[in-house]
Regions:
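Short, charged helix-capping/linker segments at alpha-helix termini
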Residues: 23-24, 145-150
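Helix-loop "lid/cap" segments that line or gate small-molecule binding pockets
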Residues: 86-96, 103-111, 189-193
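N-terminal intrinsically disordered/low-complexity leader segments
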Residues: 1-4, 198-220
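Amphipathic C-terminal alpha-helical segment
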Residues: 93-97, 134-135, 139-141, 156-177, ...
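Amphipathic alpha-helical linker/stalk segments
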Residues: 57-87
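Helix-turn-helix
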Residues: 8, 15-58
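Amphipathic alpha-helical packing segments from all-alpha helical-bundle domains
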Residues: 82, 96-104, 112-143, 153-157, ...
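Short, structured helix-loop boundary elements
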Residues: 6, 27, 49, 77, ...
């Protein structure tokens, strides 16, 4: 049984936007590639910017994998260090997938304004990732792994921002241009941003953090 029209449209939109960019991909092409009526696209998403917003905020596989960290590394279970490494790895992969999709809207003022308007109407946008990170970190704080003085919002901004600049640099300058590489950046950020606020002895020791991350990779 084929997937519902809504899912086929999302899948086709992702393929075409990746191939052509948001500015050049038309709603007619997307609907044809999905084997659906163009009216179905408008009914479900409004327009192609509505489609892009849905992909970036919820449907992009890399976004779903990033959000799954909350259940794969639940607060209070296992160690925070390994959870933060997983969080950063998934965040970088998400931003690497999202940046090419959004590039076209930044290059076209009309598309950008439409994208901003949809985000305001739907309450979507990059701030969702920040709030999700804050909620996850708060769970670890409540479980006693982060001290009560930690500014969780600032911590989330630093971690997400580091992931974004890593993805951006790798795409425009190529891998290896970030000092220490991707893994080095992840561990340095965790040590600098979260390390001083970790209260669990295993989390707070840099050597044990690195070992925990290596163990998690070996298991995965």
């Amino acid at each position: 049984m084929p997937p519902p029209a809504r899912q086929r449209i999302l899948d086709a939109a992702l393929r075409l936007i990746q191939q052509k960019g948001i500015g050049r991909a038309t709603t007619r092409e997307i609907a044809m590639a999905a084997g659906a009526a163009e009216g179905s696209l408008f009914k479900n998403f409004g327009d192609k910017m509505g489609l892009l917003t849905e992909l970036l905020s919820y449907e992009l596989p890399e976004n779903q994998a990033w959000r799954a960290v909350a259940t794969e590394a639940p607060p209070g279970h296992g160690d925070l260090a390994a959870g933060l490494v997983l969080f950063m790895e998934r965040a970088i992969v998400y931003y690497a997938a999202a940046l090419p999709l959004t590039a076209g809207s930044f290059a076209d003022r009309e598309l950008l304004h439409r994208h901003q308007a949809i985000n305001r109407e739907r309450g979507t946008g990059p701030q969702l990732a920040l709030q999700g990170a804050v909620d996850w970190l708060r769970g670890w704080q409540q479980a006693g792994h982060l001290d009560q003085q930690a500014d969780l919002y600032a911590m989330a901004v630093a971690l997400c921002g580091g992931a974004l600049i890593c993805a951006y640099s790798e795409q425009l300058a190529g891998p290896g241009q970030i000092r220490g590489g991707r893994d080095g950046l992840i561990h340095s950020l965790i040590d600098t941003v979260a390390g001083p606020h970790m209260t669990n002895s295993a989390d707070a020791d840099p050597h044990l953090r690195t070992q925990a991350a290596s163990d998690r990779r070996a298991q995965g």
